[in-house]
Amino acid sequence: MATAKPKKKNPRLASGRKRVRQDTKLNAANTSLRSKYRTAVKNVEKAVAAGDKDKAKDLFAKAQSIVDIVADKGIFHKNKAARDKSRLSAKVKALALAPAKAA
């Protein structure tokens, strides 16, 4: 059984109330970007798994942009973003170099 968290008290100071409002907005924006990042990476990996070279290249180009945006905003560390881009790039390049499958 899940236990409900005790409700937090509202801040008394105006600056504290403003901080709560700002944090809520930032949390929503960060969650949205994080989701977009994961979706972009997942789409590239699906295209690679399907063996679709052109689609994988196009999706990888879009994913790179999203990964850079997320790293610049500090949602994910820049080294994690670089590592993910590198791994995706290696998968796309391996797909491009692989001989075409007989259909």
From Swiss-Prot:
Biased composition (Basic residues): 1-20
Region span, Disordered: 1-31
Name of this chain's protein: Small ribosomal subunit protein bS20
This protein's UniProt keywords: Ribonucleoprotein, Ribosomal protein, RNA-binding, rRNA-binding
Superkingdom to which the source organism belongs: Bacteria
Organism listed in the record: Polaromonas sp. (strain JS666 / ATCC BAA-500)
Keyword Isomerase included in the entry's annotation: no
Signal peptide bounds: none
